[in-house]
Design a protein with these regions (language model features):
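Positively charged, solvent-exposed patches that mediate nucleic-acid binding
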Residues: 1-116
Length: 116
């Protein structure tokens, strides 16, 4: 099992926002940038626009779980920042998962499945 390191430093978030590749929909925005390391780093951003603390924490837990379940498919050497938009608060788990997978596929973040 791969271990993803949390991304916490503000200057790293800023670097990913300014120099990373991005994809977005109505629920999530995904930023990806190479980090030159073997493993991945994950950052989550859920602003106060999403809702109160209970709602924001629920969204954060769902995003963390979605990433954890698909962690083996994620290509290494990437910094990933997931930004929850206000519509994420009213979305259920499956909608958020579909959204994440669609955006990750768009940014070529996931390993291609098929014969090797």
């Amino acid at each position: 099992m791969k271990k993803t390191v949390p991304l916490k430093e503000n200057h790293l978030f800023r670097r990913i926002y300014s120099r990373g590749r991005t994809a977005a929909d109505s629920r999530l925005a995904l930023y990806v940038r190479g980090n030159g390391m073997k493993g991945c780093r994950l950052g989550l951003t859920v602003s106060t626009k999403v809702g109160n603390a209970v709602v924001r924490n629920r969204v954060r837990r769902r995003l963390r779980e979605i990433y954890r379940l698909h962690e083996e498919q994620v290509l290494g050497g990437r910094d990933v920042v997931v930004v929850a938009r206000s519509r994420a608060a009213s979305s259920d788990y499956r909608q958020m998962e579909r959204s994440f997978l669609k955006l990750a596929d768009k940014l070529e973040l996931l390993k291609k499945e098929g014969p090797e």
